[in-house]
């Protein structure tokens, strides 16, 4: 004989209170934007001080400059404003998606002085002696073929050209792979690499500190000697 149990009424459904049930979804959508805000626009300007960077490199109107490892173009557009319509800015990156963003914005803003260059992992693919200034910002630690990349930057600079490199400081004595993973690079390692490529160290400009002290950045300034025969032997 089948036992019959009393039929219970259905439990009442909880009614959502405003946007509270949607809060996790909203956080997932907004968090990347909040984190990215420190890497662009006025928030980044406040700690990276792009005008001071360009002053330290001696960049002025009508000059040519390469932004190597440009990403989505934070520095590219500051450089374009400094050199003006008669200048030239090469935005170099190995990510075509980032370069598309730069081209789209440059077209919208009427910045014909910006040219994107799809580089290779060991070659910025810039014309020889084409730029007065080259800049690498927070990207050198990502470069596995660093000697080849610096050789390409050296080749692209005009004699007497200036090369600036901004990177997050780290302790020396670790492997290159660890620097890549930690997104940092000791200043002394950069100086050794640059000297090997033929650059002459000029000075260390004032560095930068990320919000909340998460990272401290140094700023090294080098020069391509006027007489490169002194650093590159004749074949």
Question: Where do the model's predicted regions map?
Answer:
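Conserved SAM-binding strand-loop segment of SAM-dependent methyltransferases
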Residues: 109-122
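Conserved class I S-adenosyl-L-methionine
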Residues: 62-71
